Amino acid sequence: MSEPLPIVLIPGLLASARMYAPQIPHLWRAGPVTIADHTRDDRMSAIAQRILATAPERFALVGLSMGGYIAFEMLRQAPQRIARVALLDTSARADVPEQSAMRRAQMTLASQGRLREVLEQQLPRLVHPARRNDTALREVFALMAQEVGAEAFIRQQTAIMGRSDSREMLGSIRCPALVLVGDADELTPPGRAAEIAAGIAGARLVTIAGSGHVSTLERPDEVTQALLEWLQA
């Protein structure tokens, strides 16, 4: 019997392991789970290198939003080590100037001790409209922001602004791929997911009904099921 495949989870911007809290107990039944540290560097290449330095020799990789951007960079650096990849609520495209300008404005607020204000600005776009006043969900976002902190947030935004366009390398991804998106994701809309899936041979595209950008927390059962099916395929 082969050894269980380790699973590495990369959270999104201003997010921690709590982003995957509903999935982690179920994923452990498939293989050992680790949460990547994406808070200490301000370049995508350095973030990917740091994760790869401590990751198992071969593993399944899951990234949501910024985690997906990092996953693309890891696939550039060490494709032979990634046995499977799941790209959730993310995009293969680089920032456009308007996005970078928004990030710089948020970084300024964060540097002034106004990170909570940044989160309040973002929340309406992060979740499905029906969940915008969900107190429990808002509390999870607030706790994650506290865990990451302003300095790491600024490093993360710097890395995101400097990331490469990954569309040209989609065809080089040979491992089993899951591409998943919430049907109401405003930040990385379903069209971005379809673009990724179309570029990766054999990729499975899953759209989660009633979810915005943070599908793991908004529709946890559906996302868990999709991940388990991907791991077993």
Task: Please tell me what each predicted stretch does.
Residues 2-50, 64:
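Conserved HGGG/HGGXW glycine-rich cap/lid loop of the alpha/beta-hydrolase fold
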Residues 194-213:
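Catalytic histidine neighborhood in serine/cysteine hydrolases
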Residues 173, 179-181, 185:
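Short beta-strand/loop motif that positions the catalytic acidic residue
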Residues 211-224:
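Catalytic histidine-centered segment of alpha/beta-hydrolase-like enzymes
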Residues 63-67, 71:
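Gly/Ala-rich beta-loop-alpha elbow adjacent to hydrolase catalytic centers
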Residues 186-192:
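Conserved alpha/beta-hydrolase "acid-adjacent" motif
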Residues 44, 76-77, 81-120:
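Flexible "cap/lid" loop of the alpha/beta hydrolase fold
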Residues 95-98, 113-172:
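Conserved alpha/beta-hydrolase catalytic His-Asp/Glu region
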